[in-house]
């Protein structure tokens, strides 16, 4: 990514793929579902009701992009359709009282560590933990679809590559 100098010349300012953490949003849904599958607390054909496309958590809404939601769908469709309500309901149903187990699984996946040690400037991912002072009732549902989390694009890509390469 290039910046522009006062003289009108371009220079490489920052490699955003490794240099800046972002909230991964919907790309984190697969990571959340992978944690539940790995913990064997769900299976891919399990059904979830998307609740008309809106869920309420402590007065805050989780919404699907599709008005009215998707009805009853299975876990695979929740990922395929990128259903916020579906994925949040699935994860909340199995980890609501065990959020530490969920986050520990994420840490076990290695996503809380930088991936490219040979390149300077890669920030450490921010994966909230129930022991953090800032953890609250919204932390788990928001994390489920990538909010409150910070990862660089290369860190997200590395996780997806491990799935594509069957865990390697």
Q: For the regions a protein language model found, what residue spans apply to each?
A:
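Beta-lactam-recognizing serine transpeptidase/beta-lactamase-like catalytic domain environment
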Residues: 1-25, 31-168
């Amino acid at each position: 990514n290039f910046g522009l100098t006062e003289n009108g010349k371009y220079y490489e300012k920052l490699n955003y793929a490794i240099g800046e953490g972002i909230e991964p949003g919907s790309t984190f849904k697969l990571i959340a579902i992978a944690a539940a599958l790995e913990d064997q607390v769900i299976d891919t054909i399990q059904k979830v009701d998307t609740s008309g496309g809106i869920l309420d958590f402590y007065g805050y809404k989780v919404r699907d992009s599709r008005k009215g939601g998707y009805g009853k769908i299975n876990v695979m469709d929740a990922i395929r359709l990128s259903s916020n309500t579906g994925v949040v309901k699935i994860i909340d149903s199995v980890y609501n009282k065990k959020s530490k187990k969920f986050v520990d699984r994420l840490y076990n996946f290695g996503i809380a560590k930088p991936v490219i040690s040979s390149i300077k400037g890669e920030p450490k991912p921010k994966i909230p933990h129930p022991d953090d002072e800032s953890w609250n009732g919204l932390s788990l549902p928001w994390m489920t679809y990538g909010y409150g989390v910070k990862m660089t694009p290369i860190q997200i890509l590395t996780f997806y590559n491990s799935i594509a390469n069957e865990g390697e």
